[in-house]
Amino acid sequence: MAFEDYKTKDSVVVVYTGEGKGKTSASVGLLARALGNGWKAAYIQFIKHWDVGEHKFIREIEPVFGKRLLFYKGGKGFYNAGDLSAKDVSEAEHKQAARETYEVAYKAATSGKFDIVICDEINNAVHHKLITKADLKKLIKDKSPKTSLCLTGRDFPKDLLTYADIATNMTKIRHHFDDKYLANKGIDF
């Protein structure tokens, strides 16, 4: 097939999932690429609550991009993650935060105002039943036809993979956490 035989799509659904590192990092790279090409982008983060490196980075670039960049951090911290879970946050509070974050994501994705909407850790929110798989499917199906969507986090539902135009499974080969070392600032968060 010749290069001329290929077509382009007005928008795509991108999934970054799997047990390995790099899902959020890939989505931040996608954000940089989108903004660098003059796109309007929304970066909406589920689960994460603490001030991780990507939050600091996005907050610093927000003034540069103005109305072309929406950043929303709606998490309450790790959920169902053993000792790493937020101790003072109830299941109901986690679900409420995820629901509010979903509403922001849904509004952004369906508004037609953004070229790309990135929903970081939404797959984890679905896996832990903070929002439903039906919510995720509705987000994908109802998005504006000209809005690309990026969905990150472990455990993307296999039966929804048919809706993805690009799906990448990050595979862990080795991670220092398995040897009881905590995450490193600047590398892991």
Per-range role (PLM):
Residues A41, L149, A167:
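Hydrophobic anchor at the start of a short beta-strand
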Residues D83-P145:
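Phosphate-binding/switch loop-helix module in NTP-utilizing enzymes
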Residues I47-W50, K76-Y79, N123-N124, D155-K158, ...:
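Conserved nucleotide-binding/hydrolysis micro-motifs of P-loop NTPases
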Residues R154-F189:
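Phosphate-binding/switch region of NTP-binding enzymes
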